[in-house]
Every structure is written in C-alpha cells, then in structure tokens.
C-alpha cells in the first residue's frame, strides 16, 4: 500500500513506492462515465464519446460531445465478440486493455490523460448495460495507471 506524503505542487503529488523510493505522480481531475443519452450536466467537464459508432437516434446537438475518440474504442471484432457473449466480460476487459496498448489507441490515450491532468472528463457510451461496457473498462484501466 502506498504512503502519501502531503507535499503538493500544482500538478504533482508525492508518494512512496513499494520499495520506499520517493516518486511523484500527476494529479488527475475527476473521471466519470455516463450514458450518452443522459442529459449533459455542468459537472461533466469534457464530454468524450468512446464508442466507435455514433449512437443511434441521437443528434450531434443533443449529444453535446466535445471529443469523439474512435481510436480508443474496442475494435469491431472485439465489440462483436463481446456482443455475442456478454458473459465473457473479464475476457473482453483483458482483450480491450491489450488493444489500448497498441499504437492506434496510444495517442488517443495520451490525449485523454493530458486532458485529465487539466479538467474533469466524462466518458460517454451508448450501450444499454451500464456496468459492462467499454467505458467502464476504460475508466478502470485509466485509474489503474494512477
């Protein structure tokens, strides 16, 4: 378990790693997830659509999306595989996290992390299942990175 040292600068926090070395981590703004069909809120910050396809029946004006990161969405093959077998949630998360490490997604991940260092971000998704979707997996993956 990491011990926090309460020495802060504007964008960094200090902590002790498991080996007792002093390290610094970039602080992050709040990261939320929300179904794209829900109305925008003032606390949403930057609204980022993380689906590869545009949500059905939703106009761009009503969605009020600030950024559409198709590159960060699961591949079509992975999306279809999960759609055919929703019980394979853990397998989906593992495969999706592997895709996030590949070059097409890496620059989008960097852009997202850079925004998170400056302002709140809400990841938007269209799936009906609010607990098992790519935005949930992406949020978990980003939070594991500190």
Features from the language model and the residues they span:
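Extreme N-terminal basic, low-complexity initiation segments
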Residues: 1-9
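Tryptophan (W) side chains
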Residues: 12-14
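Residues lining hydrophobic/aromatic ligand-binding pockets adjacent to catalytic sites
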Residues: 20-146
């Amino acid at each position: 378990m990491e011990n926090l040292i309460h020495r802060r600068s504007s964008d960094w926090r200090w902590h002790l790693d498991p080996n007792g070395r002093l390290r610094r981590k970039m602080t992050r703004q709040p990261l939320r997830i929300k179904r794209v069909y829900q109305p925008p809120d003032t606390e949403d910050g930057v609204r980022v659509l993380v689906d590869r396809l545009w949500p059905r029946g939703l106009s761009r004006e009503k969605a009020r999306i600030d950024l559409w990161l198709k590159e960060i969405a699961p591949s079509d093959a992975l999306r279809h595989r999960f759609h055919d077998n929703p019980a394979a949630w853990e397998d989906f998360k593992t495969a999706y996290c592997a895709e996030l490490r590949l070059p097409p997604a890496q620059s989008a991940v960097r852009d997202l992390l850079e925004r998170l260092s400056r302002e709140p971000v809400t990841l938007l998704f269209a799936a009906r299942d609010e607990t098992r979707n790519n935005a949930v997996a992406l949020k978990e993956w980003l939070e594991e990175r500190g």
